[in-house]
């Protein structure tokens, strides 16, 4: 019996092959199968955000002006979260809340749900785009893995946190000043800066910035001067076989500065990937914990002593009082429908008052 080995070839292309060629090969800018998710979702998310910040008020959900039409600027305009009474409703345009009325849908905060969900899928589509293109040109998938960090932060902050709370109302609104207010809310209600996951996130992001600065400066310091423009892009070309900078010289320099240095480019660049991505993932895990109302570090002994001794106060106890002030102010301001009224004696004051 004879067995013929060879590559199977089809005589004619089926619909899948035609679509595959159209999406991945027959164009200058790569679209890909991931583009079927990325481009529509990104278009709708950005379009919804521009529409909301330009025209839509937050009067009915937050009692605020939030659009350019009402006098806001780029820093104060926002697409605001739905009202607290709407809980976790998806706020579909054709759903029982809006009943197909576009104006009512906007007034209820439907654009926020629209932007958040389409934005999440757009980010996932962008990560899949990196996977798909890397596979097409036979690259490893570390770009996509790195981009999982921002996706984890977005999903945890905008989706998982409000799902753990009483409604979408407690998610951040999509705007600059709105995000700042959400950060203050996180500090006041969760003592976020004293959360170990936040500390790891800060270490990751700032550590990555430090690594990038050191790496860029070191490469610039150790360039081979083998052209008439060694300090510009003119001296080198993308296909050169030679190294652009001297790793040996860089290693000797940092060995003298710190006593230790990276001796391997692969380990160096993996570390530059590992630090920020791990920091972002730790932050995302911390926000998931906040969704479940897990607490940060508590130094109760200091709080008890500060309450008993008027002369004893630490930066920690001062921050706890500050958090109480944030809660007392924001609870009444952000939830006017609750009619929260705090008498003077419950408002926080330091030992100095």
Swiss-Prot record:
It is a multi-pass membrane protein. It comes from the Eukaryota. Gene3D superfamilies: Photosystem II protein D1-like. GO terms for cellular component: chloroplast thylakoid membrane; photosystem II. One of its GO terms (biological process) is photosynthetic electron transport in photosystem II. Pheophytin a binds at residues 130, 143. CDD domains: Photosystem-II_D2. A plastoquinone binds at residues 215, 262. The chain crosses the membrane at residues 41-61, 125-141, 153-166, 208-228, 279-295. Chlorophyll a PD2 binds at residue 198. The keyword Nuclease does not apply. Fe cation binds at residues 215, 269. The D1/D2 heterodimer binds P680, chlorophylls that are the primary electron donor of PSII, and subsequent electron acceptors. It shares a non-heme iron and each subunit binds pheophytin, quinone, additional chlorophylls, carotenoids and lipids. There is also a Cl(-1) ion associated with D1 and D2, which is required for oxygen evolution. The PSII complex binds additional chlorophylls, carotenoids and specific lipids. Its main location: plastid. The modification N-acetylthreonine is found at residue 2. GO terms for molecular function: chlorophyll binding; electron transporter, transferring electrons within the cyclic electron transport pathway of photosynthesis activity; iron ion binding; oxygen evolving activity. Photosystem II (PSII) is a light-driven water:plastoquinone oxidoreductase that uses light energy to abstract electrons from H(2)O, generating O(2) and a proton gradient subsequently used for ATP formation. It consists of a core antenna complex that captures photons, and an electron transfer chain that converts photonic excitation into a charge separation. The D1/D2 (PsbA/PsbD) reaction center heterodimer binds P680, the primary electron donor of PSII as well as several subsequent electron acceptors. D2 is needed for assembly of a stable PSII complex. PSII is composed of 1 copy each of membrane proteins PsbA, PsbB, PsbC, PsbD, PsbE, PsbF, PsbH, PsbI, PsbJ, PsbK, PsbL, PsbM, PsbT, PsbX, PsbY, PsbZ, Psb30/Ycf12, at least 3 peripheral proteins of the oxygen-evolving complex and a large number of cofactors. It forms dimeric complexes. HAMAP family: PSII_PsbD_D2. This is Photosystem II D2 protein. It comes from Barbarea verna (Land cress).
């Amino acid at each position: 019996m004879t067995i013929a080995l060879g590559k199977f070839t089809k005589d004619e292309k089926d619909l899948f092959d035609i679509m595959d060629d159209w999406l991945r090969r027959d164009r200058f800018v790569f679209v890909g199968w991931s583009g079927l998710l990325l481009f529509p979702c990104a278009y709708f998310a950005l379009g919804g955000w521009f529409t909301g910040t330009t025209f839509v008020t937050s009067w009915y959900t937050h009692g605020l002006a939030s659009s350019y039409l009402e006098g806001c600027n780029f820093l104060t305009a926002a697409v605001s979260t739905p009202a607290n009474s709407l809980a976790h409703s998806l706020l579909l345009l054709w759903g029982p809340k809006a009943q197909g009325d576009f104006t009512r849908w906007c007034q209820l905060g439907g654009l926020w749900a629209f932007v958040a969900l389409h934005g999440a899928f757009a980010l996932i589509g962008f990560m899949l785009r990196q996977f798909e293109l890397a596979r097409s040109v036979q690259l490893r998938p570390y770009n996509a893995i790195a981009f999982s960090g921002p996706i984890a932060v977005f999903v945890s902050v905008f989706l998982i946190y409000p799902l753990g709370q009483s409604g979408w109302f407690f998610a951040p609104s999509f705007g600059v000043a709105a995000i700042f207010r959400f950060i203050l809310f996180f500090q006041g209600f969760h003592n976020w800066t004293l959360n170990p996951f936040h500390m790891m996130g800060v270490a990751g992001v700032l550590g990555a910035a430090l690594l990038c600065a050191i790496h860029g400066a070191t490469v610039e310091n150790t360039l081979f001067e083998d052209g008439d423009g060694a300090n510009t892009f003119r001296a080198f070309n993308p296909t050169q076989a030679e190294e652009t900078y001297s790793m040996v010289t860089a290693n000797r320099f940092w060995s003298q500065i710190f006593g230790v240095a990276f001796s391997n480019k692969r380990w160096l660049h993996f570390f530059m990937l590992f630090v920020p991505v791990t920091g972002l993932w730790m932050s995302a895990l911390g926000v998931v914990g906040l969704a479940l109302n897990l607490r940060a570090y508590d130094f109760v002994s200091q709080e008890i002593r500060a309450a008993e001794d008027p002369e004893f106060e630490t930066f920690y106890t001062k921050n706890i009082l500050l958090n109480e002030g944030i809660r007392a102010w924001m609870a009444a301001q952000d939830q006017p429908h609750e009619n929260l009224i705090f008498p003077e004696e419950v408002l926080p004051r330091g030992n100095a008052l």
